[in-house]
């Protein structure tokens, strides 16, 4: 299905995207625009394809030979689905945070510095500054500044997820993908992540997958509702939740789905 937003700047343009797990047709003719420096949410029931769509945006599926995408995904006008796309550079520009916190088995400091070292050669002073900058952006600096050399595993679940966000933005990407980042967190940690998402859009284009419709309503500027691999409706978030155009969307957001 084709749905585009009316905005002066689109960071990502998805055109006629189809995706396959082997012979299974998981995404069907998806077309949508993702606006720069805004938060776009993908919602829908389990198995609808929202996480699959998210993972096409940095070609995460290429880790699995049986998975393939067809169509076009334009990032700043360049089609990332071509064979010429440098995967390492793509993932530097399009960072990802997963459902469960995934700190590396190393210190808090090195969790942040690890990715930076892959792309930049910084002096120790500059690296210290980058680590502080990333942790500050992720609202974690005050909680970690006196224990940077402790293990990332020493942090609470909510802190670990903010560490993963800090790690993702440390390499200064353009886009940040969040795959259900709060599903394993308590309400207080969830609230802090949601506040952080609102702050991050000042500097990044943010795309979030969530099962929590209230979270999508609170955090996002645009929302896409998906069902069985199809894009059913895509609009600004207020419109989708208060005046949906499609009955399927209305049934889902009012709890009459199924």
From Swiss-Prot:
Subunit and partners: The complex is composed of two ATP-binding proteins (PstB), two transmembrane proteins (PstC and PstA) and a solute-binding protein (PstS).
EC number(s) reported in the record: 7.3.2.1
Positions bound to ATP: 44-51
Lineage: Bacteria, Pseudomonadati, Pseudomonadota, Gammaproteobacteria, Enterobacterales
Free-text function comment from the UniProt entry: Part of the ABC transporter complex PstSACB involved in phosphate import. Responsible for energy coupling to the transport system.
Subcellular compartments: Cell inner membrane
Alphabetical list of PROSITE patterns matching this protein: ABC_TRANSPORTER_1 (PS00211), ABC_TRANSPORTER_2 (PS50893), PSTB (PS51238)
Location, primary (coarse class): membrane
Keywords: ATP-binding, Cell inner membrane, Cell membrane, Membrane, Nucleotide-binding, Phosphate transport, Translocase, Transport
Protein name, UniProt field: Phosphate import ATP-binding protein PstB 2
Sample GO molecular function, one term: ATP hydrolysis activity
GO cellular component: plasma membrane
Domain ABC transporter: 12-253
Topology in membrane: Peripheral membrane protein
Enzyme class: translocase
Gene: pstB2
Keyword Membrane: yes
InterPro entries per record: AAA+_ATPase (IPR003593), ABC_transporter-like_ATP-bd (IPR003439), ABC_transporter-like_CS (IPR017871), P-loop_NTPase (IPR027417), PstB-like (IPR005670)
Family: Belongs to the ABC transporter superfamily. Phosphate importer (TC 3.A.1.7) family.
């Amino acid at each position: 299905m084709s749905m585009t937003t009316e905005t002066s700047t689109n960071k990502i343009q998805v055109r006629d995207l189809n995706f396959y797990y082997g012979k299974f047709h998981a995404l069907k003719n998806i077309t949508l625009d993702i606006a720069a420096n805004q938060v776009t949410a993908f919602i829908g029931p389990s198995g609808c394809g929202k996480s699959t769509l998210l993972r096409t945006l940095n070609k995460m599926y290429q880790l699995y030979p049986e998975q393939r995408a067809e169509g076009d995904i334009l990032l700043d006008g360049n089609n990332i689905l071509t064979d010429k796309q440098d995967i390492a550079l793509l993932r530097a520009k399009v960072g990802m945070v997963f459902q469960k916190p995934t700190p590396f088995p190393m210190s808090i400091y090195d969790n942040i510095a690890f990715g930076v070292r892959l792309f930049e050669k910084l002096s120790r002073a500059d690296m210290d500054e980058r680590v502080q900058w990333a942790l500050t952006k992720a609202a974690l600096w005050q909680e970690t500044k006196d224990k940077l050399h402790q293990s990332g595993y020493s942090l609470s679940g909510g802190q670990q997820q903010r560490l993963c966000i800090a790690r993702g933005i440390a390499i200064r990407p353009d886009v940040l993908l969040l795959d259900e980042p709060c599903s394993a967190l308590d309400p207080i940690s969830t609230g802090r992540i949601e506040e952080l998402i609102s702050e991050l859009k000042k500097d990044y284009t943010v795309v979030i997958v969530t099962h929590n419709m209230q979270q999508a309503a609170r955090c996002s500027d645009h929302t896409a509702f998906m069902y069985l691999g199809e894009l059913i409706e895509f609009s600004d978030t207020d419109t989708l939740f208060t005046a949906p155009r499609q009955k399927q969307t209305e049934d889902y957001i009012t709890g009459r789905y199924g």
